[in-house]
C-alpha cells in the first residue's frame, strides 16, 4: 500500500518512496524534526498509533503534538520542541494517549 506520510516504526523513521532510515534519538533524527519541510509523521506503538504534527505557537516557536482519533473525538498530547522529542518522550505520550482514550 502506498503512503505519503513518514512513519516511525521499530525505532526508525521511514520516508515514503525512499530507502532512507533514520534511527530515533540520533543527530539525523533531531535534524529531520527541525527541518522546516517536515511537518508530520505517523508513529506506530503497541499502545496505539498517532499522527504527530509540527505546529507554531503564537510567539512563533514550533512544537510537536500527537493526535489520535477515537469514537469521533480527537485526543491530543503535547510532545515538545524538536530538540526534546526523544523515543522515550514519544512512548510516554502514547501511553498517556492510550489511557485517556480508554476513558472515552
Where does each model-flagged region fall?
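A structured, charge-rich N-terminal accessory region that forms the first stable segment of a protein
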Residues: 2-15
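Short, Arg/Lys-rich segments that mark the N-terminal edge of DNA/RNA- and chromatin-recognition modules
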Residues: 3, 17-21, 30-80
